[in-house]
Amino acid sequence: MAVVLVCGGSAVSTAKTILYVPQDDRPVDLAYTTETARAAGYTVLTPPAAYLSGASFTGNAEALASWVEAHAGQADAMVLSMDSLLYGGLADSRKHGESMPVLQRRLQRVERWHRQYAQVPIYAFSTVMRSPWAGGRGVEPAYYLTYGRSIYSLAALQYKWHTGTLSAADKQAMFQLMGQIPLEYLQDWYSRRQKNMVLNERLIEDARNHVFTYFCLGHDDNSQHTQSSLEVAYLEKIAAAAGVTDFASFPGADQLGLLLIARAHNDFQQRHPTVQVLYPLGTGGETVPRYDGQAVEDTVAAHIQAIGGREVTTGRPDLLLAVYTPLLRGDGEAATVDNVPIMSASARTFLQQIRRATRQHIPVSIVDLTFSNGSDNTLLYGLYTQHMLYTPTAYNGWNTAGNAIGYGIGQGILAASMTAADRKNMLAVQYLDNWAYQANVRDYVQRMQLKMQRHVWEPCYAEEMTELQSLAKEQVQRYARLYLGLDPHTVEVTLPWRRLFEVAVQIRPQGDVPEEAQVRRQLREDRIKAREERVRAAAAALTQADGNEPADGKTPAQLAARQAYEDAVADLQRETVAAANARTIQEEEERAQTLRTWQPRR
């Protein structure tokens, strides 16, 4: 039974339990999703970390299924990643070696849950395999690092062949690529995609037969004119022909878990929230983001449908989705020189419309799509200078447009059931992740990494990734203090997949997080003190040697003591210079960051 507590006119707690199997253990799939749901009052059951796909290990599909069966009786709803339950996880779906009979047996096991736990609605999500232009270590088959671009180009030409747009030159290029890529790699890549297609077709059939209360098919990094877009078109045609209604298909993967939790939330409350969409001047909803392959307005509409909502253009909506698109058609990367705070008339008008809505007590969720993989510094500058950072209900400007749209709608809906403090923490996490780190700090850390590799920068830690995580934490805490007014001791920052692409930010109100700037300062001071102590010890040893030996100072003992003293002095000088140089470089880089952002208020 659900118990809803009301505070200030909005629900802040619902005693419902959601069993959630994420597609891996990245923050956007696990920590951020579950923190949002728990802040909205839900108890969230998640599998042991050892079962989930991670940075350096595959997920355990069999163990995950057994865990679901052991805990399904405690749940009011289940939100399940089929990529995890079939392959082990999202990345595992791209590189597994499972046979079709094994995969079909796993799917049949999931299908039985509809009968075994008939009282528990199942919300499932899966993905169409992506067609990346290049490989990432550990997230694609190993051969993709070498042949990824060629495979991508070949698939793009095959798209033209399927759509009847292949020219004679294209045909020649296609056959050349087929000759360059080892046949076994092509067979492996297409065989795995075929398995994914067959299983996704079966999942659509399960949605038609009401095995799932709702099923979402995500297009993982789905740019136009790729193998992925061909497969999406085929599966959507199958769903349309079968008349499947409890189904949605749209770009993105990492937002799917949270989106379906929001769908379950609306179903629990028997609500169909109304959503009004606001765009700035420019291409607006017609914008086609680089990783999505379709117009923003189509992606937004599909996400609203997926949460059981209804898009409206008049009246008072339950949520205003403020989608900030680029003035022109392209969306570049956030960590570029173009991402500087220059207020435009379009940005000012957009912010005025948001303020007007919030003054009418209409919840506003901002979706920042100006850049891919991070926030727009201009939009954040406007929110900051107009004291509006905590005015919206939610903010998202991360990774792909589909990711940000899904999170923006999911958090925007669930925020109505949160306390004001939890909403503020949710916003702070997104600002520090999407804006501070993705749009600004990540580029800083990459520059420092190059300096370290070129021996221009003396690190505090010997292990490279430990040093990079320390630098990221130091800078994100600095942004938190200067721009958000947060105590650095409440901001934890890690690089959980030991790469710079994603960060994990956690707000810890108890204030038990070390301030990384102080930690790094202390490490350098301790190194200098250790070398000063070594100089003192060497000086004492030299004095003793001179006192015990002839006065000419040329005995072996005297020479060794003098050399040890000179080495200690030189080592101290090197460390002192390195520390001073590190301070200078860091100050220069922080000034450069300020040019990309703005000078904070004092």
Describe each region flagged by the PLM.
Residues 11-15:
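Sec/Tat signal peptide C-region and signal peptidase I cleavage site
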Residues 16-519, 596:
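An N-terminal assembly and electron-transfer interface module characteristic of large anaerobic redox
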Residues 517-532:
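Short, charge/polar-rich alpha-helical segments
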